[in-house]
């Protein structure tokens, strides 16, 4: 219970940009349970959160260590892969960074398409309903495949995408709860 509380507090701090506080919460949670996974649809390990907040604080060696650990536990964790790519790009390994960023963008795009199609009659319809995230991913993938790669733009947009994916889970859950409450006539789950 304590670990979940720390992760929730860390997520809230991270979303509003209080990265040092978020990092402290995530590191404490990782000490308690280094295998902790947050989320249901978009599952993320605690080391992904540690790595993202280290990245946001500009501590790239610590970010890389945590993100490598996250990906060794779950190689399909696209947000961790995105931030590993950003970390590599920020530390001078742009070729490898670009590979990781591109792979993560393709993974996020596939994941969003899977969720929104497979679960379109349930929770999937609440994920990226305005195609904002998928449009940004498509634009970044087009930029990567062109010969006109703007690194600053790619980094800025990738950071936005990472944060936006984090927020999207909360937005989808809130919208689903609101609709369920409306469908129940404001009674929640009461008969």
Q: Predicted regions span which residues?
A:
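Terminal, low-structured helical/coil segments at or just beyond the last alpha-helical repeat
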Residues: 111-191
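TPR/TPR-like (Sel1-like) alpha-helical repeat modules
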Residues: 30, 78, 86-113, 138-146
